[in-house]
Amino acid sequence: MSYSFTEKKRIRKSFAKRENVLEVPFLLATQIDSYAKFLQLENAFDKRTDDGLQAAFNSIFPIVSHNGYARLEFVHYTLGEPLFDIPECQLRGITYAAPLRARIRLVILDKEASKPTVKEVRENEVYMGEIPLMTPSGSFVINGTERVIVSQLHRSPGVFFEHDKGKTHSSGKLLFSARIIPYRGSWLDFEFDPKDLLYFRIDRRRKMPVTILLKALGYNNEQILDIFYDKETFYLSSNGVQTDLVAGRLKGETAKVDILDKEGNVLVAKGKRITAKNIRDITNAGLTRLDVEPESLLGKALAADLIDSETGEVLASANDEITEELLAKFDINGVKEITTLYINELDQGAYISNTLRTDETAGRQAARVAIYRMMRPGEPPTEEAVEQLFNRLFFSEDSYDLSRVGRMKFNTRTYEQKLSEAQQNSWYGRLLNETFAGAADKGGYVLSVEDIVASIATLVELRNGHGEVDDIDHLGNRRVRSVGELTENQFRSGLARVERAVKERLNQAESENLMPHDLINAKPVSAAIKEFFGSSQLSQFMDQTNPLSEVTHKRRVSALGPGGLTRERAGFEVRDVHPTHYGRVCPIETPEGPNIGLINSLSVYARTNDYGFLETPYRRVIDGKVTEEIDYLSAIEEGRYVIAQANADLDSDGNLIGDLVTCREKGETIMATPDRVQYMDVATGQVVSVAASLIPFLEHDDANRALMGANMQRQAVPCLRPEKPMVGTGIERSVAVDSATAIVARRGGVVEYVDANRVVVRVHDDEATAGEVGVDIYNLVKFTRSNQSTNINQRPAVKAGDVLQRGDLVADGASTDLGELALGQNMTIAFMPWNGYNYEDSILISEKVAADDRYTSIHIEELNVVARDTKLGAEDITRDIPNLSERMQNRLDESGIVYIGAEVEAGDVLVGKVTPKGETQLTPEEKLLRAIFGEKASDVKDTSLRMPTGMSGTVIDVQVFTREGIQRDKRAQSIIDSELKRYRLDLNDQLRIFDNDAFDRIERMIVGQKANGGPMKLAKGSEITTEYLAGLPSRHDWFDIRLTDEDLAKQLELIKVSLQQKREEADELYEIKKKKLTQGDELQPGVQKMVKVFIAIKRRLQAGDKMAGRHGNKGVVSRILPVEDMPYMADGRPVDIVLNPLGVPSRMNIGQILEVHLGWAAKGIGERIDRMLKEQRKAGELREFLNRLYNGSGKKEDLDALTDEEIIELASNLRKGASFASPVFDGAKESEIREMLNLAYPSDDPEVEKLGFNDSKTQITLYDGRSGEAFDRKVTVGVMHYLKLHHLVDEKMHARSTGPYSLVTQQPLGGKAQFGGQRFGEMEVWALEAYGAAYTLQEMLTVKSDDVNGRTKMYENIVKGEHKIDAGMPESFNVLVKEIRSLGLDIDLERY
């Protein structure tokens, strides 16, 4: 087994029992692939598929004019280069986007010609607005902030059949309904009412009988009945009435008359129920007709019009009920044969027949007019309007699109469903197999008449009791719309608006000699795109607290948003976990609160297929043997198979062991024999999301707590010094690398140069392209603000001379440690109560933890100030501010902007700004005098940017933006100069590195080669030596050497060209950078100048901060205790944190206890390794100890592949504690934890004996730090990875004396954002009244509230040392008096 450069440094001991079959896929693939498919930048113009932008253009173009003589055709589109790169866009507050240009062709036809003839073609590029580009990490920069487009889980287009579960009608009767949902266009609903009549609705409007729709489609009554019913023929004669015998219809019926065979024997007596045996006897007897009583005809419906063959008179119409009068009429007219509809109560209902009777429309046109009146009430139905509306509803590609998915879902649900034998022989089978044979193949993306009829027929068949309704929460009926598809829809809607405008102008195209760019105005397109990215419900401000929150946000799927559900209407079923979520959507990670179950996270291995359905990988099983083949199955496909779990036992050849295996089939858990198994899960963690799979021992936690654990990891604040978790799950590396927080090598090579800002790697010769200079430069991100104000800072993880492979770690980022996610710190924890300080989940923590800066985090705040052009004159950013103290002025430079590095506190001026005030406009003379004598103070007010209350920190950066045409101040100029200087240095360094690398390559390439001549009179045929090359005046003279080997000579020439190109590129880049910096900035209208100040704030851990473990065990720090008072062990080491043991049993998150035990073992092993290293033991002894650690149980590690130096480096990285991986559902067993504890704390070690372990080595004796006495019982002590969450007391709490108040109530505003106060309301007053605390109450209502005089006196009294209160009248009473007076009641308060 080969280890990468980073893995060698710290191998994580895994307890996994099963080998890794499938690597964790790239976690951001859903987002990145979806947008790449939308843009199709990689594909040549003619190779672009009908997706994304291409599909949007194709669906709108060609645009034809109203008269048909001009049309606009789309040729292809191109995307330009973005003007600014990502960091520049973030700094300037603009969108990272590229200009979109489409090549459009205007074709004008000859009006005079008899057949369509092209008269003229004009073609040019048309600017279509800007399209935001995705950053490499899957986010977008919109107006300077990083945003994420969340994928949407919506109902798939297609046809769905359901019932109301008996909730609509009081009788509990099931009312069936069907709905055809297109991708865009009108919804078509069919529904039964309690009387079993069938209705339809369009777009949830008024319902109408479904037969109106069928008539509008061109069917008459007879054809409608012919489609939906089997027939019965009755023969009328003087001897009575007979009917054709259909054996299948007799079963379960009661014989109305004796059924006799040809000899007259009774086969079934009158009044007896006909059984299956009776039917066999009747069939064997060869009977073809049965006698029936004439009365049984009454109430039956005629299948067709009955016409007198002689007179042509219509005796009865189709669907007429047979009455005695009708029978008499038949008798008179000599009718010998009548055909009726075959209807029975059981499985052939009279629904369509009854609906037809309620429908009074006659014929196709009347039906269409009725539909028009329902859709457009109040508008006159002209024939043309009626036809146009009806065709546009479902049959026009412009207004209706079922989509590829919708067509697939529709066909599988109607035409391609499996029919039972009875259905095959009924009207339904004939309809699908004969009448509509081939309809599925020719189905386009609009509805056909067959589609509508097939939907109605399937619904009627459902009501007849055949088939099952659909489960709308099944993931086969819900699909994912990712960022590419959502953007495409917005782009198409913008183009559709353009189309309407263009059609109007196309008629004038020829006469006015217009070009395509004159016709097309791209404003609607860019407006649609801007609106979507800026304010759509699915475009969200990226959660950037730590790398995990970034990854999770990009992998989120939401059922909310346009075209989705709303919180209020979503019921329990939609939110619930469904069996089809298995391996696709995480059953654990979802928000608590109103969005629970509506916002989900993709499982680790889930991906979307071409149709947008989620699929998950499975290993194929053939005849009980698990193969290496992996198939991705969607929820629809999965229902057809028997799937074993990932933890099923296998023998060495991969055969399933045991008589029965636990499997899943159609959403149920079953026990199946190995030969029935068709697939097997690929990994135990396949079910859960990334956040949930980071929780070790997840299988021992209650689901509710696991949910909290998964959610709270996303709120962990990056610590100053990240520390890898001792107990992890093995997926930490994937998250750190895929989030792009940690930098990995693009190509293998040797590290040439490292400093805090950049790492330079000289690429291996075999990975460098021939003739190209092989150098990779990694610029690191330093102290940058994230969306949540946390600090993003990358630190190099390599040193010069290190040899890297592709994919090796180059630099660590926020919350990563040696390329692994490190959200918190490993804390020594004791579970015991301590003087009530850990009551109700409070956390007692050692002062040492705070002093060592273990949980110190850096937060970066951005403060802005703008100088506007006001009516009274321009605002000015200046140092000259009226009444500013000397101390504050000293921090500002001559331009009035704070220095970098200044320590600032609340209220300090950061940027001095004055605004003109006064009513009058100044005359030019006055302006001149003011300018000469500088009388600024009188007519300006101080509107400087000050440090907000409750905030203090260090200024780390200042950026000044100035509008074009306005002179820059000195500070702005110096910022530009230093930026350019730094950039030039960077470029020079890069060139130097490229040069050195190139000449090193040349030297390796040409030394020892023969030359035909060269500088310094190099003789022909002589060999080139290192000394000769060193003796040349300049290395650039090497290019003048003429080599005999032509291939090498060509390579030398290529390198020369490449270096020249690099120099030119560097100069060009410098000029571009200079232009960007020196040209004016685009600012909002009216803004002359903008200054951004970045302040770094150090937040130490303090009481009131929220902390949590990974198992949902959260709490608030109640006290930071001096280290000497903390409980300590026998060897004098104090614990870091004391937690309440009562927080474990009721919460059922036992995973934290197992983590603590395994962490305790990890720490003990680290201490043993540390001791061995200090004693300078030999590498062999270390190797033996590490072998016991890594190869005792679980996954085996190949330590023999490491050299002695690498073993020593590995051991020194484990000094603080070993690294364990306990994968989800495949973690460490109790016996393995005990094994590790025994390895860490061997019983024969005197140090171990001193600690006073119990037998299982999970508890030790602790001593009270205050008294030095041992506690009565042994205490569970161990190591847990504990996090500090983003809910910091510094950001929650504030103090206020006076401040803003509400005009209406005259009371202070509420909340920190408004600098509000605390409201002592009605109920609080009642509480004090109930206690009889009269003086406290008086104090609360007067001197602590709005009794202004009382407050002043109280201050004076305290200063004098008199502790007394002089309470007066609170302002609230005056407000009350004023309000009563406003009612016209004069009221005065008398003072006593």
From Swiss-Prot:
One of its GO terms (biological process) is DNA-templated transcription. Keywords: DNA-directed RNA polymerase, Nucleotidyltransferase, Transcription, Transferase. GO terms for cellular component: DNA-directed RNA polymerase complex. Gene3D superfamilies: 2.40.50.100, 2.40.50.150, 3.90.1100.10, DNA-directed RNA polymerase, beta subunit, external 1 domain, DNA-directed RNA polymerase, subunit 2, domain 6, RNA polymerase alpha subunit dimerisation domain, RNA polymerase Rpb2, domain 2. It is an enzyme of class 2 (transferase). The keyword Transcription applies. It catalyses: RNA(n) + a ribonucleoside 5'-triphosphate = RNA(n+1) + diphosphate. Signal peptide: none annotated. Pfam families: RNA_pol_Rpb2_1 (PF04563), RNA_pol_Rpb2_2 (PF04561), RNA_pol_Rpb2_3 (PF04565), RNA_pol_Rpb2_45 (PF10385), RNA_pol_Rpb2_6 (PF00562), RNA_pol_Rpb2_7 (PF04560). DNA-dependent RNA polymerase catalyzes the transcription of DNA into RNA using the four ribonucleoside triphosphates as substrates. The RNAP catalytic core consists of 2 alpha, 1 beta, 1 beta' and 1 omega subunit. When a sigma factor is associated with the core the holoenzyme is formed, which can initiate transcription. This is DNA-directed RNA polymerase subunit beta. It comes from Neisseria meningitidis serogroup A / serotype 4A (strain DSM 15465 / Z2491).
